[in-house]
Amino acid sequence: MYPDGLCKLDDHTWSKCIEFEDVNYQLAKPDDQTAIFEALCDMYNAHDASIGMQLSLVSRRMNREDFVKRIEIAAQGDHFDHIRELYTQMLRKQLERGNNGLIKTKYLTLTIEARDSKTARARFSRIVMDALNHFKVMGALAKELGGKEWLEMLHGILHPDGERFAFEWSWLAPSGLSVQDFIAPSSFRFGEARKFTMADKFCAVSFLQISAPEMDDRMLTELLDTDSGLLVSLHIRSMDQNEAIKTVKRKITDIDSMKIDAQKKAVREGFDMDIIPTDLATYAGEAKNILRDLQSRNERMFLMTFLVVNFSDSKQKLENDLLRAASVAQKYNCSLVRLDFQQEDGFVSALPLGVNRIKIQRGLTTSAVAVFVPFTTQKIFHGGEALYYGLNATSGNMILADRKKLKTPNGMILGTPGSGKSFSAKRSIVGVFLNTKDDILICDPEAEYFPLVNRLEGQVIKISPTSTQYVNPMDINLNYSEDDNPLALKSDFILSFCELAAGGRNGLEPVEKTVIDRAVRIVYRPYIADPRPENMPLLEDLYDEIKRQPEPEAQRIAAALELYVHGSLNVFNHRTNVDINNRIVCFDIKELGKQLKSLGMLVIQDQVWNRVSQNRDQGKSTWYFVDEFHLLLRGEVGSWSVEIWKRFRKWGGIPTGITQNIKDLLSSPEIENIFENSDFVYLLNQASGDRKILCERLNISNQQAAHISNAGPGEGLIFFGNVILPFADDFPKDNELYSIMTTKLGETGKGENEHE
């Protein structure tokens, strides 16, 4: 093995290995499945008889310590260590429910003959690049393995329980050891005919005997769906096209000869000469079909060896695993046959090295080989600040996603009432709080979030006509805009505010907008000159300044604003008197009346923008969760929401809209921009009308749509950039966090005032 990933198998044989990731094949639309299948055919056809291919699919356990380390949240000696422990308990329990730490990896090993390493490298540079391009067409991320990565992969197969791999190239010369010494298990024993042991594992190698007239693309997926270690290897080598055609023609000639003999025998015995053995007629038809495929349908002939290695903890478990694998093969009219007295050769041949010592080969055309599609479903398992979003409903893999990796991290949580929208948002809030240092802001129209916010020692701001908690809509920080004039954007907000307060049916007239803009610039002069809190203007200052303007329109605006300054709706004419800088701030607007609801939501949007612009200079992200998001999509509030959705990404803002009203989301081209500017969509159960709209908008296949039809709470589809995964999140009800986050009657309230 060379450091650059070139492997020397013998004096003239060399190999290279490519690791490729999964794509969403099983749940894709039929057209997309066909495109992947055709791309796979093209890749096989691109390799001539001088290139050996080995497709290896590995299912093994990840190192338990490493796996747990990626999901555990370390204690920090503060009030929230108990919550960290509860959250980690939940993640551990979900891990046990899922695939229990099994990871599935996929490799393509390419083998050529060359006289020396220089010649091999030169030839592999083109071959590997072509293969990577073919995977790109399929939508699969792929990379060429370096020598150390390849050794680590082999070490993982030879140590199925996930022992740690330790190796450096600089260790070889001083130690006198070879690379084999660093990857080999403690022992092998090949003394038995039908199985062998590798360290403390009981193993068996079988080959697939293909007797089905047609294969199914689900067979590999079902074969790999196991809770034990498994290695599936397909050795594939193309035949020379002319030689393949000659071989098939010879077979047809042989069959015709046998047919003539059978006819002669029938005539001698007094039977009709057209009555020939059924098998002969079948073989003749199949051979002619193969010849036609080779000559006119862009098919090639391949020789394939299909090997399966089972790894188990006990003899009984091995027998059970073998029976399960055999039943899968039987389901598709194939047989899984043990390699008697060839266990060692079979195991060496199954390892992703490009070596094939098993001479049991089956001739198949390109389409027949490509039907063994190595793809099932993608995975999202990020490290660092990734949040938990459930378990992959297809593979059982835990979904850990970091939205900051997306081009546009804006998100939507969509679902019918009772599908788990608010619960999913609260689970995300806890994840953000524990996994990051980011700030969290919540717009809460139904007063659902205060138990969680109180538990996390956040600030709940109750905005209502009778509340004594105030937020000043005139608050501004000098970083409010990305240019040097923060007043331009603030003036735009105040115009929207006045539009709602004084605009009437037809909105503000141009002259009225001019008056307001002039007054805004005047009232902010003292604060811009000396930015102290006591110099921050109030709505009353704006009202007084507008009254001083000479235009007649100014008096009309002032008269309309009087209700919000000196009248009964003067909740927004006070200085901010709450901790707006707490890490978690929840704006409770449930008791805002109809007159103030839109104004209240607009003021919250502005406060959020203040916080986002302030945090940007500190290099901190700001998460903004908006429940009942459809309420923010109308009129001036809607325009401001669209503006925020566009601007947030550049400023480190990560907004999440939560709603069941899909039709409101798509009510106008402007509002549609919010949907199109969201690379994260968390789809829970959908009503039939909304489901139809979403399937068209998001290009959802029928198989995927099944996961949002009559789905249980916490089940659906997650859209993460270009990745679509079905998920299920059955949050443990015995976890204390559940009672803080649920909105179900009878299950809420427990622990909401507890503090450590």
Give the label of every model feature segment.
Residues 1-377:
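Extended, folded cores of ATP/NTP-driven motor/assembly subunits in large transport
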Residues 413:
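Hydrophobic anchor at the beta1->P-loop junction of P-loop NTPases
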Residues 421:
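Conserved lysine of the Walker
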Residues 424:
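Hydrophobic positions on the alpha1 helix immediately C-terminal to the Walker A/P-loop
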Residues 431-441:
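Post-Walker A helix-loop "phosphate-sensing" segment adjacent to the P-loop in P-loop NTPases
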Residues 457-461, 670-683:
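A short helix-turn-beta junction within AAA+ P-loop NTPase domains corresponding to the substrate/partner-engaging
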Residues 698-754:
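Conserved P-loop NTPase
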